[in-house]
Design a protein with these regions (language model features):
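Bacterial N-terminal signal peptides that target proteins for export
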Residues: 1-9
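Short, low-complexity, Pro/Ser/Thr/Gly-rich segments in the mature regions of secreted, periplasmic
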Residues: 124-137
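Short, aromatic-enriched amphipathic alpha-helices that serve as compact interaction elements
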Residues: 32-48
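Hydrophobic pocket/interface hotspot
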Residues: 43, 55, 123
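Surface-exposed, charged secondary-structure patches
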Residues: 20, 68, 73-120, 137
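Bacterial Sec signal peptide processing site at the extreme N-terminus
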Residues: 21-33
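Short, well-ordered alpha-helical segments enriched in acidic and aromatic residues
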Residues: 49-67
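C-terminal motif of bacterial Sec signal peptides marking the signal peptidase cleavage site
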Residues: 15-18
Length: 137
């Protein structure tokens, strides 16, 4: 199994975790950095609303969707598998770096009251919007 697919359930369970809707971490940023953080917020919102099709069409970059497809997986099916666990997590964007048409968002995930995993998500500008090009690392 390819590395991106092997870690898919864990990474997406954290990424798609949704949250109990605390204050948005995107509000901590301005300009392009806020736009990047908003993409992470959109990931949470779509997961919490159980809308895997929105994640595939609005949040993930086309290249990532194609990578899933070329490995024999349907994006919507894969997102459906992990959005069932979207209630007990909180994602907090702690830092954003932008370099031209690419960006990295540092995200802290917490489950319940426990501090959790720090991970980085890479994004790229696609059709004027920031889209995830990775599922975290």
């Amino acid at each position: 199994m390819r590395p991106v697919l092997r870690s898919l359930p864990l990474l997406l369970a954290l990424a798609l975790a949704g949250c109990g809707q605390p204050a948005s971490s995107a509000s901590d940023f301005k300009g392009e950095k806020k736009d990047v953080a908003d993409t992470i917020e959109q990931l949470q919102s779509s997961a919490q609303s159980r809308k895997p099709e929105d994640i595939c069409s609005e949040v993930l970059a086309r290249g990532l969707v194609e990578k899933l497809k070329s490995a024999g997986h349907d994006c919507v099916d894969e997102m459906e598998k992990v959005t069932g666990d979207a209630d007990d997590f909180e994602l907090d964007v702690t830092a954003v770096t932008i370099s031209g048409a690419t960006a990295t968002a540092r995200v802290k995930a917490r489950k319940g009251g426990k501090d959790g995993v720090l991970t980085s998500y890479t994004l790229a500008r696609e059709d004027g919007k920031w889209r995830l090009t990775s599922l975290g690392s």
